[in-house]
């Protein structure tokens, strides 16, 4: 069974990896490409990535190990 790459979906929602890399202040897009390859965003980047993507992908989808409930990490309404 194929697991959806939510990391790639979150990044593509924002734009291309190089643009996302610049938004995070990285000198190179390599870190962002590694996130996609491993389908894992560093814990300290999850909320910002979701926010930049307009919450199309949730923290729970990106890191269910850190955000076990579907609404964890989402902004309060």
Please describe what each predicted stretch is:
Residues 23-27, 54:
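A short, basic/aromatic helix-end/turn motif that makes direct DNA contacts
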Residues 4, 8-9, 14, 18, ...:
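Short, charged recognition helix plus adjacent turn
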Residues 26-40:
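Recognition helix of helix-turn-helix/homeodomain-like DNA-binding domains
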């Amino acid at each position: 069974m194929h697991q959806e790459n939510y990391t790639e979906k979150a990044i593509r929602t924002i734009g291309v990896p190089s643009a996302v890399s610049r938004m995070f202040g990285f000198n190179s897009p390599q870190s962002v490409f590694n996130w996609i390859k491993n389908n894992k965003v560093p814990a300290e980047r999850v909320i910002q990535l979701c926010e930049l993507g307009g919450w199309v992908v949730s923290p729970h989808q990106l890191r269910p190990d850190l955000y076990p409930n579907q609404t964890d990490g989402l902004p309060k309404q």
